């Protein structure tokens, strides 16, 4: 059998090794100059005013919700077809996640679904830029402005995604992820961008014990050795080891995403003759980052179920992913919201399958996946 082809693999090279070595030899390995450089680079990439690096996108979501004073009695609108960390953070703060349906073919939350879910208790809206494509953020942001509700963009899949000519996160507040499978990675990490100066100040405090400054800031600017706690906070800062890797990856972003697009195009062309259904692309002008390439496997149409397809691909040495099992179908949320029905979400959650997609894949790797799909479709 051929070597196992994983669903994803980080594209690491000698540049990342050199970046880590530089930090280790510098004597400053926790939050420091590499963090500052990463934050500045994301301001430049997105065009936004403030960037706050954190230990994960989940940490970023947690403190953003906290900074917006979301808590008991509040509601936060989000799709169910997302990673559960968003729902978990809302719930842990005592608020209620209001899960809404998505478009059946793009899997994007729609402005109409969001607006229909608004109540006097709605405190925030969290749209997801799904799989590397952008949601219709202008329309969603307009709803937030009309009702006076904060919009927090889940941009975990969207490093390199553009909407109407502007990078995701160009305005408002957005949260990116640097997890191991993301378009750029530093193993674990995240970053928040915002154009709200007061929010940025609160986020910097909340990510580091509630202090007004961090250790590097104190050393650099000669401030008092013991900073003062301004509010209870967390330990969500990113180390310079991670930031250095992220910076190196960011310098490669154009190449990394170009390679993803090439593989995605190869899949698209082959799937045109197969019963497996890829996602539709959004109608608005955009640049897709191709974080994921997802097909829908309908047993009646394809002659095989999604789970059986994933197992058959595994037997052929090909890994796959599931992004995502709908949150409202998982035990805790199923029991908390027993009557919730989201037809488009449920139909897709039972059928979606993420194919291997990462920059170091070869054309032959993609051909191997395509050949396996052809065989499993009986062609």
UniProtKB/Swiss-Prot annotation:
Record Pfam families: DegT_DnrJ_EryC1
Enzyme Commission code: 2.6.1.87
Pathway: Nucleotide-sugar biosynthesis; UDP-4-deoxy-4-formamido-beta-L-arabinose biosynthesis; UDP-4-deoxy-4-formamido-beta-L-arabinose from UDP-alpha-D-glucuronate: step 2/3; Bacterial outer membrane biogenesis; lipopolysaccharide biosynthesis
Entry cofactors: pyridoxal 5'-phosphate
A GO CC annotation given for this chain: membrane
Keywords recorded for this protein, A-Z: Aminotransferase, Antibiotic resistance, Lipid A biosynthesis, Lipid biosynthesis, Lipid metabolism, Lipopolysaccharide biosynthesis, Pyridoxal phosphate, Transferase
Catalytic reactions on record: UDP-4-amino-4-deoxy-beta-L-arabinose + 2-oxoglutarate = UDP-beta-L-threo-pentopyranos-4-ulose + L-glutamate
Modified residues (N6-(pyridoxal phosphate)lysine): 182
Subunit organization: Homodimer.
Family note: Belongs to the DegT/DnrJ/EryC1 family. ArnB subfamily.
Database matches in HAMAP family: ArnB_transfer
Protein's name according to its UniProt entry: UDP-4-amino-4-deoxy-L-arabinose--oxoglutarate aminotransferase
